[in-house]
Amino acid sequence: MPEVHRYLCDRLLMMDKGKVVEDGDTETVIKHFLAPIEPVKPLAPIKDEKNAVVWIDGAWKKYDMVTHHTLIRTIEMQDINIKIPRGEILGIIGPSAMGKTVLMRLLGGFEKPDRGHILIRIGTVDFANIAEYGKRSIEARSKLGIIHQEFALPPYQLVQDLFARKIGLKKLEMINQAMAKAKEFGISDVTMDVLLRLADLPEAEAKGRLRELGFEIDVLDDLFPKLPVREAFKAAEPYLKAVNLPEDIFTRYISETSVGEEIRLAIATLMASNCEILLLDEPFGDIDPISLRVVTNSLKELNREFDTTMLVVSHQLDVIRELTHEAILIDEGVVAMRDKPDEVCDAFIERRFK
């Protein structure tokens, strides 16, 4: 990243297509490298700051930090209370291993709080507590889409199949069909809720958890039918446009896309499934700043056009400053600060949150 190079380097090489195309002082090379970067798109204002769609209500969660099967320490998230209005992009920052990903897993329904509620709006005024399993949680979680740390889409899958499968797993009409089918096999709503949560996990973790329950990964394909390709394209079209991807990407293999395109594809598949709330847990990885700007501008476009609510965990503070309406800082399992992104990022850098 340019900020790291500025801090560490006196000299830089710039490479393109396997060749060194420039060798010079750090600032000059960075300037040339960033020349084609898109301008920053403005962030749309929140329409109604009192219209909460996510509500973490007094959540407590004790968790262990383990490395190589060795317990490092135990951290307790204590009495977390956060309301997030529809259409807000909320940044989440803080030191490593201090609760950010645990918070996202609570919001995704992959972990249950020891106490408290994780509430998602399912009607005009009604909330469902996704810490409880069943039909209401299924409806609430159909509105949630998550991209995990170091995510990877299956490289040899066609993009059209990716959309068809994800819509089958997330769109409420498809879920209702699957639940009716499950009843014929004696599968309860609670079990279906568990299966749908596991389907949102990274593939390796999902396979392991399914086997613990006595299922193979194929159970998801058996219960949740893919959307026909023509219908999948119709659902995908407006979101491909919003994230600045060409329509012909729909017929490519995922291995034929770039890293920046892959992230935008993952986002578009969730949006095409009618997700209203995106949970982005450090999905940007080592993406270059030019591609990253395209991604952040695409997220702003989705937010502006569809009023999508987003929670974004990132260690890249420039992303938080540029992308979010507001940010929170989590340290030692507690929300240490909530304010404008620049204020929170500056406090984090200067260690003013202790």
What are these regions (language model features)?
Residues 1, 314-315:
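H-loop/switch region of ABC-family ATPase nucleotide-binding domains
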Residues 278-281:
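Catalytic Walker B motif of ABC-type/P-loop ATPase nucleotide-binding domains
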Residues 157-184, 200, 209-222:
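Q-loop/switch helix immediately C-terminal to the Walker
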Residues 19-40, 334-354:
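Conserved beta-strand-loop-alpha-helix hinge in the C-terminal portion
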Residues 117-139:
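ABC ATPase NBD Q-loop/coupling interface
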Residues 146, 151-161:
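Conserved catalytic motifs of ABC-family nucleotide-binding domains
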Residues 108:
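Helix-to-loop junction immediately C-terminal to a conserved catalytic motif
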